[in-house]
Amino acid sequence: MPSHQIALPALSRRALFRQSALLGGAAALTSLPFGRQLLAHDVSENWPTVAAMANRYVSERKLANLLLTFGWGQEDHAHTVGGGNLSLAKPGAVDENSLYRIYSMSKPITGMATMILIDEGKLGLDQPVAEILPAFRDMRVLVDPAGALEDTVPANGPITIRQLLTHTAGLGYQIVSKGPLQAAYNQQGLVGGRVSRMPIPGFPVVTPAPGLAAWADRLAELPLMYQPATKWSYSCSIDLLGRVIEVASGMEFEAFLKKRIFDPCGMTSTWMQVPQSEAHRLTDNIGVLGGNVFPLDPAGNSIFFDKPEVPAGGGGLVSSPKDYDRFLRMLLGYGRIDGKFVMSEEAVRVGTSNLLPATVDLTGSWLEGEGHGAGGRSTGATFGWGGAAGTLAAVDFDLNLRSCLWTQYMPSEAYPIRDEFIAAMEADLKVMRAKKKAA
């Protein structure tokens, strides 16, 4: 089935996860008195600025399905703030079990799946990818990233697993590349995520490659945008890791995620393909154009009910707030959840740290002055990433806090909700600190 793509926008500004820098020394918040008595309840009274922001977006009908979740430490349930409806067109409130297209919030999951295999010795962090996928040996690099595909030079070194985890391999992306390389990505079906069954004016209809193995082979035939380990450039590298995981583990990518992450984390509502039996939980994804909203991927006819040709580790998952909070809780527990290890403490510590090669130039990139771990931004204290439909998730190891913004709209820059969410969190946490100090 053709995949209708829209340009998935820049996921954040430099300030995406800046709360760790502004809230230094706030680890004592973990002992604030919201405890067990508030589990599974709305905690808007503790987050009034966040709640006001959420209520404004919902009441103005800018968004339907806005929900914010917070969890402290290893609390076994996320607290919620806000909550609209599954759709702008009909009633039915969202909750922690509602289903959202998480797009690039898939990347930290694939990153941690890779870290599991590194921890087990089946992959090496600085191992050349060509040792796993020989087609990636002897890569070529475009002289001009937007120039002719024939105008190339040899790569100065091999692509490594570290580079794939951190978008420093020099690979392109259908939503980032320009000129002939972007056209080649479209022609070869090198898509990283699905948007809608409906045609979208102004955007190409792309037929995906017939499977993850074919997708990887086709990618290897195209030149890189940049020399490996020289520049941070948002790319399809996390999607390629799905194929690396298959070969290294001997399992299909989706099966590996289920066995090694979803099942042990207790994530029962995270899929590449939403079962029809769960259709009643799926939110609408809306488009925003000129201040007007329209159904982009309505839940009743969602493309996510179809089995994807290519399981996209960089942008293909649907999940629930409850499920993703359990993933964040596992990270915050350094690999442990409900008394059991999903992955080792070392694998989490390494995967959430700054893994950028020392030779990479971040000038002018989204990450300038910050770091990147296994599929997500790393600031030292925080780790996380966002999704193309407005979602945002992070763990803060200093605060012992897990937080997530849930909504569904495209393009994500249509509203400044991410920046507003972070600013609102900062304001409420400042009040919490003051109250604790006064007490």
Q: What residue ranges belong to the model's regions?
A:
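N-terminal secretory signal peptides
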Residues: 1-15
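N-terminal export leaders
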Residues: 12-32
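Short, conserved catalytic-motif segment at the N-terminal edge
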Residues: 43-102, 122-124, 138-150, 380, ...
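Active-site SXXK
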Residues: 54, 74, 101-129, 238-246, ...
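Short, surface-exposed loop or secondary-structure junction motifs
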Residues: 78, 140-379
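Short, well-ordered beta-strand elements
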Residues: 79-81, 393-395, 400-410
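Glycine-rich phosphate/pyrophosphate-binding beta-alpha loops
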Residues: 310-316, 382-394, 408-412
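Short, gly/Ser/Thr-rich active-site loops of penicillin-recognizing serine hydrolases
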Residues: 333, 337, 352-362, 412-439
